[in-house]
């Protein structure tokens, strides 16, 4: 059995579409654990309606305690051999579980599909194929280099034991940074398939789109706990240091931080600490250009070095696109001339 866990909070506008996509799964041996996290809109009533019509749906009501608490509660109440998390404003392909389950072979603990923010892409039915397969270290390196493996908790089918080893950090946002990497740390193997099975809806008030608040500073608490969880792994710790350096700088940019901001020192201290951990490995320094740029001039990285690097990078990308377009046009012209002369 597969347990599908859905934390629910004030999503009445999207919830029915989400639950219907789970209900319509072609793999039917499922239970759907809905954890209503103190919704004040019509979400609870929608959940109750699905539970009345389909015995596979089970509703748990709790006071508002946050998404992590809701997910942990869902895991505790579930009984499936495998677990999948679905956010209540998203949609999954009706074939998703049927596609992922066959890849859950011996020693494979996680199977991941692709997600999209474009609905037209979501509805394309393409055959699945493996695009990555690896052990814990290989998967973590792939993830921190922003390749096939993602650290988000959704889009994945998990073997139950992995999820039980790593509860979600409660009381934080960005908790998936810690949980996602630690899932990879504790697993044996992961398989990633080139199958778009998950539609991720970006809402105006989501964590990724809202304006900066003090709650965004949770990324440092989560990041420090992630670093601490690898303190006994001398081989991987510098890579985690680089990952948090990258994440920390990404949040510096996303949150609109500058030298005049009251939190600037907090961001820069975290970036500095993460870079120090990363530079303990010559291999990590050699491998990651952004880290080398930072170590070259730490004081000027956010204000001078990185902005110049990005401008040059964007200019190179634009030039490369222009060259590719010209090559395409020349190729088409050659074909046309060949046909004409023939």
PLM feature spans:
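Short beta-strand/loop segment that forms part of the nucleotide-sugar
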Residues: 29-38, 58-63, 88
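Short aromatic/hydrophobic "clamp" motif used to bind/position activated sugar donors
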Residues: 83
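Cell-envelope/extracellular polymer assembly enzymes that use nucleotide-activated donors
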Residues: 1-3, 21, 31, 178
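Membrane-interface aromatic/basic loop that binds lipid-linked glycans or pyrophosphate carriers
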Residues: 259-342
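Glycine-rich, basic loop-to-helix element that forms the pyrophosphate-binding segment
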Residues: 62-78
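Short, well-formed alpha-helical segments that are part of the catalytic scaffolds
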Residues: 10-24
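Donor-binding/catalytic cores of nucleotide-activated saccharide
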Residues: 67-68, 88-191, 201, 205-214
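A conserved acidic beta->alpha catalytic loop
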Residues: 21, 28, 36-45, 65
């Amino acid at each position: 059995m597969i347990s599908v866990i859905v934390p629910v909070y004030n999503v009445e506008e999207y919830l029915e579409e989400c639950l219907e996509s789970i209900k319509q799964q072609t793999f039917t041996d499922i239970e759907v654990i809905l954890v209503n996290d103190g919704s004040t809109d019509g979400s609870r009533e929608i959940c109750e309606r699905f539970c009345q019509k389909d015995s596979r749906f089970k509703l748990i009501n709790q006071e508002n305690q946050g998404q992590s608490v809701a997910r942990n509660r869902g895991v505790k109440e579930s009984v499936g051999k495998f677990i999948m998390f679905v956010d209540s404003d998203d949609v999954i392909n009706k074939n998703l579980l049927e596609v992922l389950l066959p890849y859950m072979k011996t020693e494979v603990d996680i199977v991941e599909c692709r997600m999209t923010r474009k609905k037209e892409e979501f509805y394309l039915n393409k055959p699945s194929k493996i695009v990555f397969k690896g052990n814990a270290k290989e998967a973590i390196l792939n993830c921190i280099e922003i390749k096939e493996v993602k650290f988000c908790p959704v889009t994945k089918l998990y073997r139950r034991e992995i999820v039980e080893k790593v509860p979600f950090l409660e009381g934080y946002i960005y908790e998936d940074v810690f949980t996602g990497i630690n899932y990879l740390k504790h697993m044996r193997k992961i398989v990633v398939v080139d199958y778009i099975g998950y539609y991720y809806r970006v809402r105006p008030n989501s964590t990724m789109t809202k304006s900066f608040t003090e709650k965004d500073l949770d990324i440092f608490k989560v990041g420090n706990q992630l670093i601490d969880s690898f303190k006994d792994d001398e081989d991987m710790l510098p890579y985690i240091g680089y990952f948090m350096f990258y994440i920390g700088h990404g949040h510096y940019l996303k949150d609109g931080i500058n030298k005049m901001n009251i939190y600037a020192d907090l961001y820069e201290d975290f970036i500095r600490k993460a870079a120090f951990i990363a530079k303990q490995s010559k291999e990590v320094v050699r491998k990651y250009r952004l880290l080398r740029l930072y170590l070259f001039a730490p004081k000027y990285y956010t204000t001078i070095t990185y902005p110049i690097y990005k401008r040059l990078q964007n200019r190179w990308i634009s030039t490369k696109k222009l060259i590719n377009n010209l090559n395409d046009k020349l190729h088409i012209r050659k074909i046309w001339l060949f046909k004409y002369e023939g």
